[in-house]
Regions:
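Proline-threonine-serine-rich low-complexity tracts
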Residues: 1-275
Length: 275
């Protein structure tokens, strides 16, 4: 309006108050908010005599939009989405464009492990004339959740001649929210039992993901010796003279084997009946 862009004034040799009017011719610019006006001012006296002058009014958009809401920095778990719907959206206003366009671009830097990284998200608000401004949001992706041991082997009792290898006593398995293949290991603590062939193993299973988060479970393996030895050679019945020795070295020895004890002890006792 002329109140903002300037008013024309005129004088006349006879008319003390010539009428001043204007008309505008508008030419569009390179964007919707820019254009130029050729304003023609006309001064007319009471007798219809007139004169004109021209004014050029150039309308520009050089003001960048204002980002009214830049999402705050945020930390999310590695199994969460980094989509703006989860991490936050930016919004903007502009002095001329009613709907400035808001976009973003990401620059990702790896962390200490494969599942951890940092995103520098640059939000940019641009109006229809290409004026732009930006703000920065930092998105930190962490892996702080330990694996879940989905199958911890049950406590088990085995014979002393059986293997305590997990292939026999049971294997643990695990899943993780981010690592597709958490590592499962175990360690054993052995407590001796009442005899050399009997003992108890406390087996601690450990599931660890690529970021070092871990969880454990325990399995008790009881090793028993409940199988008696086998007498492999029993001394045969025998008849001897009364002046011969009844010692086993003369009458025969028995021998035995055992599933666990390499040297079972063989003893004997006698019951005598008079002839």
């Amino acid at each position: 309006l002329p109140l903002n862009t300037g008013l024309a004034s005129a004088t006349d040799n006879c008319d003390p108050a010539p009428v001043v009017t204007y008309s505008d011719a508008t030419v569009a610019g390179e964007c919707p908010q820019e254009y130029s006006i050729t304003r023609t001012w006309t001064a007319t006296d009471a007798c219809g005599n007139s004169s004109t002058c021209s004014q050029s009014v150039i309308v520009e958009d050089t003001t960048v939009p204002t980002i009214t809401s830049c999402p705050p920095d945020v930390t999310v778990e590695c199994d969460e989405s980094t989509d703006p719907m989860n991490t936050g959206l930016a919004s903007a206003t502009d002095n001329c464009d009613p709907a400035p366009v808001v976009t973003y671009s990401d620059a990702t830097v790896g962390g200490q492990c494969p599942q951890e990284y940092t995103i520098t998200r640059t939000w940019t608000a641009t109006d229809a004339c290409g004026n732009g401004t930006n703000c920065i949001q930092i998105i930190t992706v962490d892996d702080s959740t330990p694996p879940t041991i989905t199958d911890c082997p049950a406590d088990v009792t085995i014979e002393c001649d059986e293997t305590t290898d997990p292939g026999n006593t049971g294997l643990a398995s695990a899943t993780d929210n981010c690592d597709t293949a958490p590592v499962v290991t175990y360690s054993d603590l052995t407590l001796e039992g009442g005899c050399p062939q009997e003992y108890t193993i406390t087996r601690t299973w450990l599931a660890t993901d690529a970021c070092g988060n871990s969880s454990t479970c325990s399995q008790i393996i009881t090793v028993d010796d409940s199988t008696p030895p086998t007498i492999t050679t029993c001394a045969a019945n025998i008849t001897i003279e009364c002046d011969e020795s009844t010692d086993p070295s003369n009458t025969g020895l028995s021998s035995a084997t055992d599933n666990c004890d390499p040297a079972p002890v063989v003893t004997y006792s006698d019951a005598t009946v008079a002839g």
